[in-house]
Regions:
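Membrane-embedded helix-loop-helix hairpins and adjacent transmembrane boundary segments
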Residues: 1-562, 569-621
Length: 621
């Protein structure tokens, strides 16, 4: 499969002239950072560009940061796997951004407080301990959230340029990209970020529109709908269709994420706090609602075009991404869009598009690196020193943290093994921070009875969102309600393992109170019925051998005394005497919605039971 992928990426139109275009652009970006270094002399200028960003530059820099290469890649991945049904994510994002622009929900009141970061507001409203804890939760969730950005960006460059898609190439590209981003973010701060964001906004806007037009022209507009209908049916168009992989639960989760992206996520809020006035801020969000939708819909379309191309015009790619043999692992579908573009775009233009995508990559990374390093400096380190740090020291600490965070995302990209779609991974890791942050900002700004104890409890409750990650669920699966405890394996052959047969339990005498409690607790979970044929289909089996090694695999079919899995890894084979436990994975959307409800509950309850002795006004400045 590795050789097949190498052959697939090698058929690119990327040439020497394209490399020249990319290098010239990168040198221009670094040059800008050196030029504006003189203007980054204090923390306000370094972090928020002196709070002097106008409406149209604000729109450009907000779009530049929020439409990074990671956005293009995860949106294309959703289009490739889900078809036109994925459009609902972008449509919802645009609608929510427009409503926030019209109402000023959360962001206007934050701007009126003239804070540099969200945790700084926590201190004004709830006290120093809340600010420090909020900064820790924000940094923890945010760093996990951006952990795969670097690897995904490297995969795009490897796929579109025709490099050998092995770990050496991906890792080398990761190091080079990280070095470039670190140089101009460390040197210039937010001023260089805003200026490069503007340039990248222009290049990326033109590049993504031209690419979309060429992609549709190549595969044919009619073929788009026909192919999606043929292979995906109604699920390729309707996000609430049975087989779409989304559903109403996911749609509701997307509405909340729309609020998060605009009003809670620090990189977007940092742009709001840099605006020259609240009027400019509201205008920024109102107009940016268009880009909030387009930034996902056009990459969705590129992913759909890649799917149509693979299924109709590239049998070699079809064998790579959709192998017929059940025991052959499909290649990561993140490669689909860049390989597709590498084959259809002409030399010269492909260099411009790649430069635009790298621009998007750098735009996101500079904003995120600056944001998280600022949070750690301003909201964790500075409060611990009781504000005794002067501006030069804070800037120096921030620059050191930018480098350390860069090294962390390099490490995380190399070693994280989760199999979630990138968008779903980002939503879950971000929820560690934003589920608690929503309670604190909404309650703190609009509810005068919100207390510091309730705030601390809500922030701590947000950590439960980490259960949405696949590796974490696997580690704690025995604690998930409805799961099946360890069973001893009595026989194995090929992809099937046998154990003692499950029997349907006898009916228990009805108890209205007990039934009500059980129904309430089990509502988010699925109760196992292993005595039925295929009662465990699509569940996950976790096999543990005598050495303590575990392996999780999806169940394809099940009987009362056996399960058949999709495939065993080459280096793992279950034996008689090993144990198997079984659980139903929780979707990221379900975990996210559960965490939102949980954090709001503990915030309200904590505020009512433990009110502050001296209440602060919700609009306190």
């Amino acid at each position: 499969m590795e050789s097949a992928l190498t052959n697939a990426t090698s058929q690119t139109n990327f040439t020497t002239i394209d490399w020249v275009i990319v290098v010239v652009y990168l040198l221009l970006s670094v040059g800008i950072a050196f030029f504006v270094k003189r203007y980054a002399g204090n923390m306000t200028n370094f972090v928020s560009a002196g709070r002097a960003v106008g409406t149209w530059l604000g729109i450009a820099t907000l779009t530049g940061t929020e439409m990074g290469l990671i956005t293009v890649m995860y949106s294309a991945q959703k289009g490739f796997t889900s078809g036109f049904a994925a459009f609902h994510i972008g449509v919802i994002a645009g609608i929510v951004a427009f409503l926030i622009g019209v109402t000023g929900f959360i962001v206007v009141r934050l701007r009126e407080h003239e804070v540099l970061t969200i945790p700084e507001y926590y201190e004004k409203r709830f006290g120093r301990r809340t600010r420090i804890l909020g900064g820790i939760m924000l940094a923890f969730g945010g760093l996990l959230n951006m952990g795969l950005f670097l690897k995904v960006g490297a995969m795009f460059i490897v796929g579109i340029t025709g490099m050998v898609p092995d770990s050496v190439a991906v890792n080398t590209v990761m190091v080079v990209l990280l070095a470039l981003v670190l140089v101009y973010t460390v040197i210039g701060g937010m001023i260089s970020v805003v200026i490069t964001d503007y340039i990248q906004f222009v290049i990326l806007s033109v590049g993504i529109l031209v690419t979309g037009w060429l992609a549709i022209d190549f595969v044919g507009w009619d073929n788009l709908f026909k192919t999606v209908r043929t292979y995906k049916g109604e699920a390729g168009f309707n996000p609430v269709a049975a087989e779409s992989g989304f559903g109403w639960e996911y749609v509701g989760w997307m509405f909340f994420l729309g609020i998060v992206n605009c009003a809670l996520w620090p990189t977007a809020v940092a742009r709001a706090l840099a605006m020259e006035s609240t009027t400019a801020l509201k205008r920024q969000y109102t107009w940016s609602s268009i880009s909030f939708a387009i930034r996902m819909i056009i990459p969705n379309l590129l992913g759909i075009c890649a799917f149509v191309f693979v299924m109709n015009k590239a049998p070699d790619l079809q064998a790579v991404f959709f192998p017929e043999e059940a025991d052959v692992k499909a290649v990561d579908n993140l490669y689909a869009m860049p390989i597709f573009l590498g084959r259809i775009l002409p030399a010269g233009l492909i260099g411009l598009i790649t430069a635009a995508m790298i621009a998007a990559f750098m735009s996101t990374h500079d904003g995120y690196l600056l944001c998280w390093s600022t949070v750690i400096t301003q909201d964790i380190i500075a409060p611990l020193f009781k504000e005794r740090l002067d501006n030069p020291t804070r800037i120096k600490i921030t620059r050191i943290l930018i480098v350390l965070i860069g090294l962390y995302i390099l490490y995380w990209g190399l070693f994280y093994t989760g199999e979630e779609d990138i968008w779903d991974y980002m939503a879950v890791t971000g929820a560690i921070y934003f589920t608690g942050a929503f309670s604190l900002l909404f309650g703190g700004l609009y509810w005068h009875r919100a207390s510091s104890t309730g705030a601390v409890l809500a922030l701590m409750a947000g950590i439960t969102a980490v259960i949405g990650l696949g590796p974490v669920q696997q580690a704690v699966h025995n604690w998930i309600p409805g799961s099946i405890a360890e069973q001893t394996i009595t026989a194995t052959y090929e992809k099937t393992i046998e154990f003692e047969a499950f029997k349907e339990p006898d009916e228990v005498e009805e108890s209205p109170v007990r039934d009500m409690v059980v129904d309430f607790v089990m509502t988010p979970f699925e109760q196992a019925k292993p005595w039925r044929f295929n009662g465990l289909k699509s569940w996950t089996a976790v096999v543990q051998n005598a050495a303590g090694q575990t392996q999780a695999v999806e169940i394809r079919t099940s009987d009362p005394d056996a399960v058949t899995v999709s495939a065993w890894p080459e280096d793992f084979e279950p034996q008689v005497g090993d144990t198997v436990s079984i659980y139903k994975p929780l979707s990221g959307a379900r975990v996210g919605l559960m965490t939102i409800g949980f954090t709001l509950f503990v915030f309200i309850l904590g505020s009512l039971i433990f009110p502050d002795r001296k209440q602060k006004e919700a609009t306190n400045e």
